[in-house]
Amino acid sequence: MSAVRSKICGITRIEDALAAAEAGADAIGLVFYPKSPRAVTVLQARAIIAALPPFITTVGLFVNASRCELNETLDAVALDMLQFHGDETPEECDGYHRPYVKALRVKAGDDIAGVCRTYRNARGVLLDTYVEGVPGGTGETFDWALIPDDLDKPVILAGGLTSANVAQAIAQVRPYAVDVSGGVEKSKGIKDREKILAFMSAVHGT
């Protein structure tokens, strides 16, 4: 099996982005959802991206953003990939002509395979924990047994991952990538360098 990729999401500070890169993360996530405690402005995002070393993928997270808002962000910020956490339709996601992943908050009875088929142009599906009224960043895990074995898209596993459980998650789910936010924080939006290092060591089995 190929090495599992990793994304540190909810980055709000340059020092946290650099800590993620130095620890071996493949990507960082920048939240463009004003209601989130991890939200960044365009100016913050540009400063963070400008400080990154080469080959770190920058992912912009959006929740039901208007086309105007999203286009303004894309014009101002050099994002490599989009991540949609709201009720965006496949047509809306496709309309920006950027690589994207679609997030699904998983609960019993969800047709995850059907979502993958519906969002046929998505590069992957991000599976997160369902908490009513919260689009992501809950800090809670979900039942990984709900994930089908035969999905036709790369799975990015999120939801309550920490250095204590990510190795088990990788062994059970065998995802393409893992995504962490709260599990490597001191407080919402403020990352902890030691927690990032511990998480990445667990991902890499070192």
Curated annotation (Swiss-Prot):
CDD domains (UniProt xref): PRAI
Group of enzyme by EC: isomerase
Keywords: Amino-acid biosynthesis, Aromatic amino acid biosynthesis, Isomerase, Tryptophan biosynthesis
Pathway: Amino-acid biosynthesis; L-tryptophan biosynthesis; L-tryptophan from chorismate: step 3/5
SUPFAM superfamilies, A to Z: Ribulose-phoshate binding barrel
EC number(s) from the headed UniProt entry: 5.3.1.24
Source superkingdom: Bacteria
Listed Pfam families: PRAI
Family from the record: Belongs to the TrpF family.
NCBIfam families: PRK01222.1-4, PRK01222.1-6
Protein's name in the database: N-(5'-phosphoribosyl)anthranilate isomerase
